[in-house]
């Protein structure tokens, strides 16, 4: 169910290109060279494309840190099986994860895994709640179930960058925290001047770990479709029970904490929608004011 839809950009009245065409024309994306070195599903950003990717990441990190009291972490990209079990990736999604058999370690599909496991087997003090954690990571997904889906360009890749937001909160406050998590992510989309919508997932579409989830989608005019760029979820005590993450409540009793997470945001589809939305008829890309301090240019041409 669509709960918010915000379309403020004027419809482009020229021959609109998709991100693959724009990337090739401006020499900022090279999927052919990436495929030569790694196979399909791996992007190669170059020149001002690499600059834009890095600017998006740094802008997102800085925005959340400056405005919402997050603590930043730079976590391992490899985790043990029990860490992936805590957050719900194992055993159900083992086929979608890259596994290093010799060391029995998994490449993380999201920094949610490592951020949540910071407090595995901990008892947190009520005085120190809520805890807001942020982490940038590369993310790795085999996309084993992607047959028949649109995998062109940046739409579905095996390696991508993402800024992740994780919260540890008192149970009675977790749904208010979910609403604020969604707002924090959509604020980024507003500042990037992208059209977007927020979808509340029905029970049948929820992951087995989540109690409630909102998906954020951006409009990509070159693709002529909505692209999912974030999921914001309240897991209630699902992850905390698996990871034995507890807190002492106001009565002095020990109880399981509620965990939430959201992408704030994942970059590949943001990158695609960004260059499609801000393309000009002359082939250049306009850079919104929010990113100009990070790129020190006002356009890519």
Regions picked out by a protein language model, each given a short descriptive name:
Residues 7-301:
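TRNA-recognition modules of translation machinery and tRNA-sensing kinases, especially anticodon-binding
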């Amino acid at each position: 169910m669509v709960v918010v839809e915000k379309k403020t950009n004027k419809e482009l009245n020229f021959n609109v290109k998709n991100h693959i065409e724009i990337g090739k024309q401006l020499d900022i994306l090279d999927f052919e060279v990436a495929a030569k070195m790694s196979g399909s599903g791996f992007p190669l950003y170059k020149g001002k494309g690499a600059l834009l990717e890095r600017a998006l990441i740094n802008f997102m990190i800085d925005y959340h840190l400056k405005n919402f009291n997050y603590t930043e972490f730079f976590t391992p990209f490899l985790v043990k099986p029990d860490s992936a079990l805590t957050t719900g990736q194992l055993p159900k999604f083992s086929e979608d994860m890259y596994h290093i058999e010799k060391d029995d370690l998994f490449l993380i599909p999201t920094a949610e895994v490592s951020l949540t496991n910071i407090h595995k087997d901990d008892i947190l003090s009520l005085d120190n709640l809520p805890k807001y954690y942020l982490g940038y990571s590369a993310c790795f997904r085999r996309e084993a179930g992607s047959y028949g889906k649109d995998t062109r360009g940046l739409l579905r890749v095996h390696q991508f960058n993402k800024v992740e937001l994780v919260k540890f909160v008192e149970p009675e406050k977790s749904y208010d925290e979910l609403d604020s998590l969604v707002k924090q992510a959509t604020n980024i989309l507003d500042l990037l001047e992208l059209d977007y919508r927020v979808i509340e997932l029905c029970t049948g579409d929820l992951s087995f770990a989540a109690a409630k989830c909102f998906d954020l989608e951006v409009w990509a005019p070159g693709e002529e479709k909505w692209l999912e760029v974030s999921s914001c979820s309240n897991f209630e005590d699902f992850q905390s029970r698996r990871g034995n993450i507890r807190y002492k409540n106001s009565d002095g009793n020990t109880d399981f904490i509620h965990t939430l997470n959201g992408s704030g945001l994942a970059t590949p589809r943001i990158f695609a929608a960004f260059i499609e939305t801000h393309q000009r008829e002359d082939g250049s890309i306009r850079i919104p004011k929010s990113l100009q301090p990070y790129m020190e240019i006002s356009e890519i041409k």
